[in-house]
């Protein structure tokens, strides 16, 4: 196998227009009146990126502080998008306990790709959160 083949494959995948999937761009988290949403959580993800960020949606305004997520959202989020100049801090247990992770501005279509400790990941593992924008 040519050493050039993996490089060409990586370049081809990077140039695919839908590589980020059906998730909105982080810059698109704005309201018509000029205010912005800090982050959006989605309860559906998929091995195919174009099918991510589907299902139910939870929008968070800047300053959202939820040590206890609503019962239908606890351990449910599997995709998320964070607006520019915003940061979403999540915890694995209610009351802001357990493992923690900070997501900066960007699109995260598959939370399975983000490690939570040695054996876990962040898909269906968010029990508390805090979202802030500067």
From Swiss-Prot:
GO BP annotation list: exocytosis
Subcellular localization, as worded in the UniProt entry: Zymogen granule membrane; Zymogen granule lumen
Secretion signal, residue range per the UniProt entry: 1-21
A GO cellular-component term linked to this record: zymogen granule membrane
PTM section of the record: Contains intrachain disulfide bonds.
Pfam families: Syncollin
Keyword Amino-acid biosynthesis applies: no
Membrane disposition: Peripheral membrane protein
Cross-referenced InterPro entries: Syncollin (IPR028137)
Keywords: Cytoplasmic vesicle, Disulfide bond, Exocytosis, Membrane, Signal
Subunit structure: Monomer and homooligomer; most probably hexameric. Interacts with GP2.
Functional summary from the UniProt entry: Functions in exocytosis in pancreatic acinar cells regulating the fusion of zymogen granules with each other. May have a pore-forming activity on membranes and regulate exocytosis in other exocrine tissues.
Protein name stated in the entry: Syncollin
Organism, as annotated: Homo sapiens
Name of the gene encoding the protein in the UniProt record: SYCN
